[in-house]
């Protein structure tokens, strides 16, 4: 039988748009794994996804599994027959399981003994008989956080299922998936094309759906069309569309037949901060904002309809009518909020709980104010501006605008601060206090903003760890991992002279007696060092490089960064492997030794030429390295230390460290200890693999 194209389509009610791509990709990956596990040869597995369907198309699927030779070893001959040569129950049970008698079994003889053996030629199963079960298994493994039941069925899925189509070439595969019998019926667009029609062959998909059903099943093709049409629509009105990938993905998942249209709103709304308008357009309505070449918001937006209308202006007008009240709300909130100064909202912060054991948002504000001032003093920022920014940092949370449009927190604080006449770096700090919000996000731009951002995040870390609510597994309700990484990124990338030890101690001190975890400082630092590990692994540094630095537990992030980069460079040197091995050997020798070492090497006790040479090199190097260590020039220091390869190799080749003479032995151990201490000034390179 020849290989054929296999198609499966699961027709559903509207699937969650933000999960659609992940569902489709997982379906394809799961089914591919099932095919491989079943030893069914196949070509490319393509996935399709639209709001009301998930589908897979497999090229060149084998009609059956290959035949195979089956061997099952039974009991040893000694256990298969008793002393009289009669078959035992063990042998009979094994033979019965194989579908034969003991007499029909073969013998397997090796140098370890002799066993009963069943050998047979197993014919591969037909793909038809396997596919429905494999599809069901693949679907059962989809990442669905919440399943639904529908009708009177016991079956559960992410959304109710109405059709299942499984075709191998032009042959319908019988069977049930999710309680639905396989059929040739496909459902088209809700309002265009044919509501239902039949498909004759798997090779007709997805073209038949496009032509008869008016559904673009190819997700990436649909996304590309939306992107291209939106860019062209923006160009026609002299602008550039904000086609953020997350919104583009969501819109792609909402439509089956994308039609891109352009609409407008009243120019008077442009007096409202653009962030509030964009929040409404993107977040609520799934519209694409349009900007001019200078980055200013235009009074237009682009949206995607799910239907091709004879009167597109009617659809455009409808969307304009929908968005106008939301923009009017934003205008009203903006004008109303500006009747009060930001600081007038401070008393209301006392009515909002930050965390039951840690007090109100006003309590948090007071701590942030003090900590931001402290951080500013450490990094050379304006202390007065930092403390002022700390005082105002949460006031915008009490405004009408932020209450209604929550994602505008921070940015509205900036606009209101400017209206109140606050210093510009105070206003900017209010906007940037939450940065970085996600991996790759921009950092705060000014020193005052950095001080506020660090203070806000460290207050949360100290408080939540201080009451023992550490992140567990995937659960991190206070986003502590993001907060820790944000602090580290700011300190490292801005090269700030902050130490996690003193920073955490200050954050903890400001809580007074509220915290119950006596180990809170150490817990926070260990947690942050753990985030360092994850960050640098993502950056491409090897695990053992990071472990080598973590062994020294450096608590200044900028210093940690310099050490990691130095060790990564050291690994590229020819001497690295030998010196890492030597350090490991030295570490083991010193760990096993019970001798008390001297404070310094006694040159008069040195006997062998190799130990004298090594000691001389260490003296010379120590003078060179002292200023390098002091200035954090670790890469240069390790390059200098790489010159020790030959004297270290010679020492281990020619010198007996554990000499019988105690004075000689202790002197040599002291020499090795000093060698290791020089490397440990940077990292523990003995852990390098």
Curated annotation (Swiss-Prot):
EC number: 6.1.1.14
Protein name from the UniProt record: Glycine--tRNA ligase beta subunit
Protein keywords: Aminoacyl-tRNA synthetase, ATP-binding, Cytoplasm, Ligase, Nucleotide-binding, Protein biosynthesis
PANTHER family, per the entry: GLYCINE--TRNA LIGASE, CHLOROPLASTIC_MITOCHONDRIAL 2 (PTHR30075:SF2), GLYCYL-TRNA SYNTHETASE (PTHR30075)
Catalytic activity: tRNA(Gly) + glycine + ATP = glycyl-tRNA(Gly) + AMP + diphosphate
InterPro entries cross-referenced by the UniProt entry: DALR_anticod-bd, Gly-tRNA-synth_bsu, Gly-tRNA-synth_heterodimer
Gene name tied to this protein: glyS
PROSITE patterns tied to this protein: AA_TRNA_LIGASE_II_GLYAB
HAMAP family per record: Gly_tRNA_synth_beta (MF_00255)
Assembly information from the UniProt record: Tetramer of two alpha and two beta subunits.
Biological process according to GO: arginyl-tRNA aminoacylation; glycyl-tRNA aminoacylation
Stated family: Belongs to the class-II aminoacyl-tRNA synthetase family.
Upper lineage: Bacteria, Pseudomonadati, Pseudomonadota, Gammaproteobacteria, Enterobacterales
UniProt organism field: Pectobacterium carotovorum subsp. carotovorum (strain PC1)
Enzyme class (EC, first level): ligase
GO CC annotation terms, alphabetical: cytosol
Subcellular location: Cytoplasm
One term of GO molecular function: glycine-tRNA ligase activity
């Amino acid at each position: 039988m020849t290989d054929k194209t296999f198609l499966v389509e699961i027709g559903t009610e509207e699937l969650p748009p933000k999960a659609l791509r992940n569902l489709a990709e997982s379906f394809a990956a799961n089914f591919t794994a099932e095919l491989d596990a079943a030893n069914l040869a196949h070509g490319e597995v393509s996935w399709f996804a639209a709001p009301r369907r998930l589908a897979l198309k497999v090229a060149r699927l084998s009609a059956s599994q290959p035949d195979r030779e089956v061997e099952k070893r039974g009991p040893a001959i000694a256990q298969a027959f008793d002393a009289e040569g009669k078959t035992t129950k063990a042998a009979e049970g094994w033979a019965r399981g194989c579908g034969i008698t003991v007499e029909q079994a073969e013998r397997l003889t090796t140098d370890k003994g002799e066993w009963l053996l069943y050998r047979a030629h197993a014919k591969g199963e037909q793909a038809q008989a396997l596919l429905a079960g494999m599809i069901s298994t693949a679907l059962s493994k989809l990442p669905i956080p919440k399943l639904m039941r529908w009708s009177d069925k016991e079956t559960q899925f992410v959304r109710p299922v109405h059709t299942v189509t499984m075709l191998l070439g032009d042959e319908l595969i019988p069977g049930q998936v999710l309680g639905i019998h396989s059929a040739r019926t496909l459902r088209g667009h809700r309002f265009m094309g044919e509501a239902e029609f039949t498909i004759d062959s798997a090779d007709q998909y997805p073209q038949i759906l496009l032509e008869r059903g008016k559904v673009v099943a190819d997700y990436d093709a649909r996304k590309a069309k939306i992107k291209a049409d939106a860019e062209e629509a923006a160009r026609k009105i002299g602008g550039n569309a904000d086609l953020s990938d997350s919104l583009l993905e969501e819109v792609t998942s909402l439509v089956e037949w994308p039609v891109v249209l352009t609409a407008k709103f009243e120019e008077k709304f442009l007096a409202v901060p653009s962030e509030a308008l964009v929040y409404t357009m993107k977040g609520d309505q799934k519209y694409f904002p349009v900007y001019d070449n200078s980055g200013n918001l235009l009074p237009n937006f682009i949206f995607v309809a799910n239907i091709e209308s004879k009167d597109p202006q009617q659809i455009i007008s409808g969307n304009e009518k929908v968005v106008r009240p939301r923009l009017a709300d934003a205008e009203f909130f903006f004008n109303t909020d500006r009747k009060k100064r930001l600081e007038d909202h401070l008393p209301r912060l006392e009515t909002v709980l930050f965390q039951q054991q840690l007090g109100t948002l006003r309590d948090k504000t007071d701590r942030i104010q003090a900590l931001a001032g402290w951080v500013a003093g450490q990094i050379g920022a304006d202390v007065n501006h930092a403390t002022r920014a700390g005082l105002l940092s949460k006031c915008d949370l009490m405004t009408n605008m932020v209450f209604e449009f929550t994602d505008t927190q921070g940015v509205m604080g900036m606009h209101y601060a400017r209206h109140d006449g606050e210093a510009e770096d105070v206003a900017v700090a209010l906007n940037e206090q939450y940065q970085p919000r996600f991996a790759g996000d921009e950092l705060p731009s000014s020193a005052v903003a950095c001080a506020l951002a660090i203070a806000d995040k460290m207050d949360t870390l100290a408080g939540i760890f201080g009451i023992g609510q550490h992140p567990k597994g995937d659960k991190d309700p206070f986003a502590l991992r993001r907060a820790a990484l944000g602090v580290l990124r700011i300190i490292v990338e801005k090269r700030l002279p902050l130490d996690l030890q003193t920073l955490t101690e200050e954050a903890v001190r400001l809580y007074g007696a509220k915290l119950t975890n006596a180990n809170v400082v150490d817990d926070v630092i260990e947690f942050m060092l753990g985030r360092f590990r994850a960050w640098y692994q993502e950056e491409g540094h090897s695990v053992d490089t990071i472990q080598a630095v973590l062994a020294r537990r450096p608590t200044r992030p900028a210093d940690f960064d310099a050490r990691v980069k130095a060790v990564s460079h050291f690994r590229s040197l020819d001497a690295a492997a030998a010196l890492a091995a030597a350090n490991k050997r030295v570490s083991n020798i010193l760990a096993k030794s019970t001798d008390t070492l001297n404070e310094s090497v006694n040159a008069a006790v040195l006997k062998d030429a190799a130990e004298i040479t090594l000691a001389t090199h260490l003296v010379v190097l120590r003078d060179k390295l002292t200023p390098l260590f002091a200035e954090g020039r670790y890469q240069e220091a390790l390059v200098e230390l790489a010159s020790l390869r030959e004297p270290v190799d010679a020492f281990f080749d020619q010198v007996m460290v554990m000499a019988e003479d105690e004075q000689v032995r202790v002197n040599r151990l002291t020499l090795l200890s000093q060698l290791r201490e020089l490397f440990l000034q940077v990292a523990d390179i003995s852990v390098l693999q």
